[in-house]
Amino acid sequence: MSAAVVATLPTLLLLLGLAAADCPSSSWVQFQSNCYIFLQTTVKIENIEDVRNQCTDSASGADMISIHNEEENAFILETFKKRWKAQDDILLGMFYDTDDESFKWYDKSNMTFNKWKNSEESQDLIDTCGFLQPKSGIWKKGNCEVSSVEGALCKAAVSYEKKYLPDHHILITALVIASTTILTITGAVVWFLYKRNLTSGLTNTAYTTAPQLPYNDDCILVDAEENEYVA
């Protein structure tokens, strides 16, 4: 039975590992199906791509922040209050597309939500970036040509396995696979022992000595002589 348990450990550890691997590392914070991190280092930049590189280099599939609803914006604001520290406005992962005159997210997700200040007036938006005010959660427009930023706010989607296979499903799957493997290996061991004992029994039977006659050669000779004398 111990061999069966050992045999299931790699599968069990792999599945439980998936359950623990919500985000790229413990430095990231998960909200719904995404992970977030604020890389709090002052970065001298020439353009927004330098900030974006901080995110794309931090984890596979990561990019600058995109925000799609009030709940996500509130989560970002709350996390800045409790965990992240920032005084300056934070660059959002958006750019102004002059072809269709609209803002777009760098991660190519749809622009379905905004939190612009009510006082924002239409203006020449070429080289305009979006900024998040970490204390209010309000967005504002500003020139992309900034010499430095306080940090990079990054976002990465939770892996497919975690997004579509929740923790309790992973645990149940792990237990089912482990139990099935243990039963299979145990059954194989029992069958092997049964076959070995059966083969051993047949071998012993084949080598059993033949039954001896009730008389040995000397007795037969004496009986023959007595019969001859009587005759």
UniProtKB/Swiss-Prot annotation:
Q: Where is the signal peptide?
A: 1-21
**Cytoplasmic topological domain:** 191-231
Annotated localization: Membrane; Cell projection, Filopodium; Cytoplasm, Cell cortex; Cell projection, Microvillus
Q: What are the TM regions of this chain, as residue ranges?
A: 170-190
Report disulfide bridges, numbered on this chain: C129-C144
Gene Ontology cellular component annotations, sorted alphabetically: cell cortex; filopodium; membrane; microvillus
Q: Name one Pfam family in it.
A: Lectin_C
Q: Which Gene3D superfamilies match?
A: Mannose-Binding Protein A, subunit A
Name the chain's protein: CD302 antigen
Q: Give me the gene this protein comes from.
A: CD302
